[in-house]
């Protein structure tokens, strides 16, 4: 019998206006979720839509973009400055404000706590993921398009300081530690200012980095995409390549014996399976799943 992981509904999207749609989710350094929400963008084209229709949709900007975030149990909605954030699909806390990035051309916007643009950084073109730390470090992971396209993305994962200067390049680190280089970084977990974990294509090792030094590495640990949580000696992740018949899946794996892998069902507090497609987001031990209708948080004590 498959394992069960219990999730609590964190936010029901029915509380949003009808023309609001969650376009991106992340986790901040406090372990709380961050949601980028589009206002007024048309629904995504149907499954039989043409490529041209999908491109038009992708290039259609929303009327406004909002950031929903939490401080403790207090929920806040912030409308972002139209000169920043509209074309972004990454969000993180940054100092007293916000970092909005991931768009084409490498532009990353630094905004104050009111969502007003203050300055821009160039962190490379279209990173897979961006995660920040409370001391101002910016970790960016890159896809194969950037890895093989030249530029800073060729290093697979890069850590930048608060001014946008590269202070750690994974390709150099991998060579120094006899690790495979990154072809495409599928998942990254920046636990805190000292600790970072990576899972990447094509060998799919699990690599633990502490203070920019190799802590531990497991060869051929297995694919995890797009996120994983570290709970002691256990890893919780979304299973790769398994969107079979419209159903996402989770895995629970032991770090101490990586061969011990078991499928896990996501259930709510009433024991009902969270069915259909969902997307995982994580940071440290904090793990959430995002469906079309709600955001759920893993209950770690159950």
Where in this protein do the model-derived segments appear?
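A short beta-strand motif characteristic of beta-propeller blades
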Residues: 9-16, 73-82, 115-122, 166-179, ...
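Repeated scaffold domains used in trafficking and secretory/extracellular systems
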Residues: 17-30, 43-44, 81-95, 123-135, ...
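Conserved beta-propeller blade signature
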Residues: 34, 98-99, 138-139, 196-198, ...
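Short, conserved, GDST-rich strand-edge loop motifs in beta-rich repeat architectures
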Residues: 36-60, 139-155, 242
């Amino acid at each position: 019998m498959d394992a069960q992981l219990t999730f609590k509904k964190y936010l029901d999207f029915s509380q949003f206006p009808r023309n609001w749609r969650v376009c991106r989710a992340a986790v901040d350094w406090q372990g709380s979720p961050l949601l980028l929400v589009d206002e007024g963008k048309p629904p995504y084209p149907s499954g039989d839509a043409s490529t041209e229709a999908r491109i038009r949709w992708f290039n259609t900007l929303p009327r406004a973009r909002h950031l929903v975030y939490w401080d403790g149990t207090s929920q806040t909605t912030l409308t972002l400055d139209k000169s920043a954030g509209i074309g972004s699909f990454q969000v993180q806390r940054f100092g007293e404000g916000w970092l909005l990035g991931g768009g084409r051309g490498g532009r990353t916007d630094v905004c104050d706590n009111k969502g007003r643009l203050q300055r821009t950084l160039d962190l490379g073109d279209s990173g897979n993921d961006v995660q920040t730390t409370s001391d101002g470090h910016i970790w960016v992971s890159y896809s194969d398009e950037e890895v093989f396209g030249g530029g800073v993305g060729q290093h697979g994962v890069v850590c930048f300081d608060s001014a946008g200067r590269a202070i750690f390049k994974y390709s150099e680190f991998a060579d120094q530690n006899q690790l495979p280089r990154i072809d495409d970084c599928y998942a990254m977990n920046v636990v805190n200012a000292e600790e970072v974990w990576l899972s990447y294509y094509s060998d799919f090792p699990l690599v633990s980095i502490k203070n920019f030094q190799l802590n531990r590495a497991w060869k051929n640990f297995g694919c995890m995409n797009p996120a994983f949580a570290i709970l002691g000696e256990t890893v919780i992740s979304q299973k790769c390549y398994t969107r079979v018949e419209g159903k996402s899946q989770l895995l629970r794996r032991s770090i101490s014996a990586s061969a011990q892998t078991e499928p896990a069902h996501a259930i709510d507090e009433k024991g009902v399976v969270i069915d259909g497609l969902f997307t995982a987001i994580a940071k440290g031990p904090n793990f959430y799943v995002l469906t079309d209708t709600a955001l759920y948080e893993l209950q770690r004590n159950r």
